[in-house]
Design a protein with these regions (language model features):
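A short glycine-rich, Lys/Arg-flanked "PGG" loop and its adjoining helix->strand segment in the class I
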Residues: 151-166
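N-terminal auxiliary segments of SAM/dcSAM-dependent transferases
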Residues: 1-27
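A short acidic, Gly/Pro-enriched loop at the edge of an enzyme's catalytic core
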Residues: 126-137
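Class I SAM-dependent methyltransferase SAM/SAH-binding core
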Residues: 69-73, 77-127
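Short, glycine-/aromatic-enriched active-site segment of Class I SAM-dependent methyltransferases
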Residues: 172-193
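Conserved alpha-helix/loop element of class I SAM-dependent methyltransferases that forms part
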Residues: 34-40, 45-66
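Substrate-binding/catalytic lobe of Class I Rossmann-like enzymes that use SAM or dcSAM, i.e.
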Residues: 187-245, 251-271, 279-280
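A short SAM/SAH-binding and catalytic strip from SAM-dependent methyltransferases
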Residues: 137-148
Length: 280
């Protein structure tokens, strides 16, 4: 990993996602599904189905079932955890830096009206409010890269997992250390992201923390397809948005989606899925 020209803090990340929370809901997904999709092919443009497929693949790879106690680290608006609890009957906790997204997740949970055993908490994954050896599973989707202290994040995940517990997650990747000015502006600085792991670097870091690697997938085509589809969605949304400030933000995001595709082609941005186990 390399250090960005500007060192963003957790407070910077929290502020960004609090401030942009409603805008993301307005043009991306009203229910807060805001992660990378697992598409069937280059002609597949069904984002919601692809996003659901990502969640289903992680749940299956992680072996989540009705006996699981799941922590969603960086849960955002909460749809993944609610979906897991609804489908599998598992118990769950969601933790996120953004108070706006946690409040939204709580409202979504109340609206689910299904007696789900799920709780959402505002807090940092670098100082989790849970006892050692609590969870059978820790999951996450495209969130942990944003935490500046990645070593502390992984050690906290390791701490709260039970022996034999599973860490199943997807995350953005930084395939190479040197990032162009365009890539830094449109991919990294845009969401207050300092730096990330490469595909192999992520696995090495997990092993160094004490995990055993179970599975890893390098999914470059999936993230490129996601931003192609989301960019098209954003452009369409901007065309029917009257509020000029919001419209300008959405159009800037749509432009960034195109830049993200170029950054992927330059080898500056990637995406992967990882399954790791805490030794029994």
């Amino acid at each position: 990993m390399t250090t960005a020209r500007q060192a963003f803090t957790e407070q910077d990340v929290e502020g960004f996602f609090d401030q942009t929370h409603q805008t993301y809901l307005d043009f991306w997904d009203a229910e807060g599904v805001l992660h990378t999709g697992y598409f069937l092919g280059l002609d597949d443009d069904d984002y919601r189905a692809a996003a659901q497929r990502t969640s289903d693949v992680l749940a299956a790879d992680g072996g989540i079932d009705g006996s699981s106690y799941v922590l969603d680290a960086g849960c955002g608006c909460g749809p993944f955890l609610i979906d897991l609890a609804r489908k599998h009957g598992c118990k769950g906790e969601g933790l996120d830096l953004s108070s706006e997204r946690i409040n939204f997740a709580r409202k979504q949970l109340a609206g689910a009206n299904a007696g789900l055993d799920v709780t959402f908490t505002h807090g940092s994954v670098t100082a989790m409010p849970y006892e050692d050896n609590t969870f059978s599973h820790v999951v996450s989707q495209d969130a942990l890269c944003l935490v500046p202290d990645k070593a502390k994040t992984q050690s906290e995940v390791f701490r709260v997992l039970k022996p034999g517990g599973i860490f199943a997650f997807s995350d953005f990747l930084q395939p190479k250390p040197d990032i162009s000015e365009r890539g830094r502006t449109h991919v990294y600085d845009r969401v207050r992201w300092n730096s990330g792991f490469s595909y192999l670097g992520y696995q090495q870091s997990l092993i160094h923390t004490g995990f055993e690697m179970v599975l890893a997938r390098n999914l470059l085509t999936q993230i490129r397809q996601t931003y192609r589809v989301i960019g098209t969605m954003a452009t369409a949304r901007a065309a029917v948005t009257d509020n000029q400030v919001e419209k300008d933000w959405i159009l800037a995001f749509a432009e960034s989606c195109g830049e993200i595709e170029l950054a992927i082609d330059r080898g500056e941005f990637g995406w992967g899925m990882f399954i790791a186990r805490k030794p029994a």
